């Protein structure tokens, strides 16, 4: 199964156009075959381009969200996602918009983009939820418990929607087929459409009573706790797919999937920039002047960093390989440490004399008896 387009770009399903464009530029530069050392860079680059093409086209994105990844790709192979035809590109279809395209989808897949009739097995729908993790979890990888409320097969009627001893009769509206067929004239010719029978909800049979537990739905909502494997290096907004943890299928169809969108909490020390991390670290005036070796924090413990003599406040140093793990790739990003020279708030007598001597040696004339605020007051 190929990767969901939202996951390819690392954006949430409600991402706007600017977010998608920004994510595309970042991914495209990361996987461009001319610069990437990833052996699968060319294929990933193609996936990124395809994801951008679909998600930046309003009609294609609407189809994609409605049909899901696999069914959208199947429709695309059949040529059913050519949105230009819905804009008048096929002669006589101008003004048809999505209505005309949806008619074609229903011909291929049935209502809602499904390839099976109601009387046959139907896969359950995918469910979506969010999971919050902290940056340490995203760095090391973690197994998290997630409690979700989801539809499950009714235990009293085994998903049938009626008691096992309920009387039944063949639906007269569809003659027991569970479907009603109509023929429509379109710009592409006569199109036969098959829809679910509204009288029997596609079952072909009408029962004398419904299950009192699920009220005929065949499903009930229950709370369940799942174990979610969060991989090291995952980014904020990326989605994990849990196979078979979605809504139950119908007529023996497989369950849908659970899509877990990862949200990473802000960190008090580090800011994340892709696979890189950034932080600020204080150093003293003597350390900046003479140079020193200081300990700086990383998500894997403190490490030593050399501060050269003459370092200026705001200068940034790069620690290679001390950033985030690269998801599904080898290695880590880098850590960028911006140093800040801290001015002491108070001095003892010895420190004061030393700084006075330093100022005099440099030819600076500073009234050390009068502080800044005293100078400011006396100027008015």
From Swiss-Prot:
Q: How is the cofactor bound?
A: Binds 2 Zn(2+) ions per monomer.
Q: Which residue numbers delimit the J domain?
A: 4-68
Q: Where in the cell is it found?
A: Cytoplasm
Is Cytoplasm set as a keyword in this record? yes
**Segments traversing the membrane:** none
**Segments of this protein annotated with the region Disordered:** 27-126
Q: Which cofactor does it need?
A: Zn(2+)
Identify its protein family.
Belongs to the DnaJ family.
Low complexity compositional bias, start-end: 115-124
Detail which positions bind Zn(2+) 2.
171, 174, 197, 200
Return the SMART domains for the record.
DnaJ (SM00271)
Compositional bias annotation for Gly residues: 88-100
Q: Which gene encodes it?
A: dnaJ
Q: What's the entry's take on its domains?
A: The J domain is necessary and sufficient to stimulate DnaK ATPase activity. Zinc center 1 plays an important role in the autonomous, DnaK-independent chaperone activity of DnaJ. Zinc center 2 is essential for interaction with DnaK and for DnaJ activity.
Extract one GO cellular component term from the record.
cytoplasm
Zinc-finger ranges (CR-type): 141-223
Task: Report biased composition (Basic and acidic residues) as residue ranges.
Answer: 27-87
Positions annotated to bind Zn(2+) 1: 154, 157, 211, 214
User: Which GO MF terms does the UniProt record name?
Assistant: ATP binding; heat shock protein binding; unfolded protein binding; zinc ion binding
| The name this protein goes by in its record | Chaperone protein DnaJ
Q: Enumerate the UniProt keywords alphabetically.
A: Chaperone, Cytoplasm, DNA replication, Metal-binding, Repeat, Stress response, Zinc, Zinc-finger
User: Assembly state and interactors?
Assistant: Homodimer.
């Amino acid at each position: 199964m190929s990767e969901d387009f939202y996951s390819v770009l690392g954006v949430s399903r409600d991402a706007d156009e600017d977010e998608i464009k920004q994510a595309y530029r970042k991914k495209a530069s990361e996987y461009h075959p001319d610069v990437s050392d990833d052996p699968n860079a060319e294929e990933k680059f193609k996936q990124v381009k395809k994801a951008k093409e679909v998600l930046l086209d309003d009609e294609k994105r609407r189809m994609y969200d409605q049909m899901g990844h696999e069914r959208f790709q199947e429709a695309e192979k059949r040529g059913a996602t050519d949105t230009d035809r819905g804009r008048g590109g096929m002669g006589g279809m101008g003004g048809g918009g999505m209505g005309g395209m949806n008619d074609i989808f229903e011909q291929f897949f049935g209502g809602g983009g499904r390839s099976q009739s109601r009387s046959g097995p139907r896969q359950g729908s995918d469910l979506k939820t969010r999971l919050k993790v902290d940056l340490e979890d995203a760095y090391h990888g973690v197994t998290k418990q997630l409690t979700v409320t989801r539809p499950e097969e009714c235990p009293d009627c085994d998903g049938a929607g009626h008691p096992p001893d309920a009387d039944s009769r063949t639906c007269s509206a569809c003659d027991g087929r569970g479907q009603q067929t109509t023929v429509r004239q379109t710009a592409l010719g006569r199109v036969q459409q098959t829809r679910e029978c509204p009288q029997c909800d596609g079952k072909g049979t009408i029962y004398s009573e419904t299950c009192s537990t699920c009220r005929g739905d065949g499903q009930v909502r229950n709370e369940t706790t799942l174990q979610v494997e969060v991989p090291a290096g995952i980014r904020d907004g990326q989605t994990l797919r849990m196979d078979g943890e979605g809504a139950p299928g119908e007529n023996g169809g497989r369950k849908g999937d659970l899509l877990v969108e990862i949200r990473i909490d802000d960190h008090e020390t580090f800011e994340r920039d892709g696979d890189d991390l950034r932080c600020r670290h204080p150093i003293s005036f003597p350390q900046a002047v003479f140079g020193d070796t200081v300990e700086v924090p990383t998500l894997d413990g403190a490490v030593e960093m050399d501060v050269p003599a003459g370092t200026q406040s705001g200068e940034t140093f790069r620690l290679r390989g001390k950033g985030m793990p690269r998801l599904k790739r080898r290695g880590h990003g880098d850590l960028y440490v911006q140093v800040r020279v801290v001015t002491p708030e108070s001095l003892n007598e010895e420190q004061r004399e030393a700084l006075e001597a330093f100022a005099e040696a440099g030819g600076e004339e500073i009234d050390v008896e009068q502080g800044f605020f005293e100078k400011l007051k006396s100027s008015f």
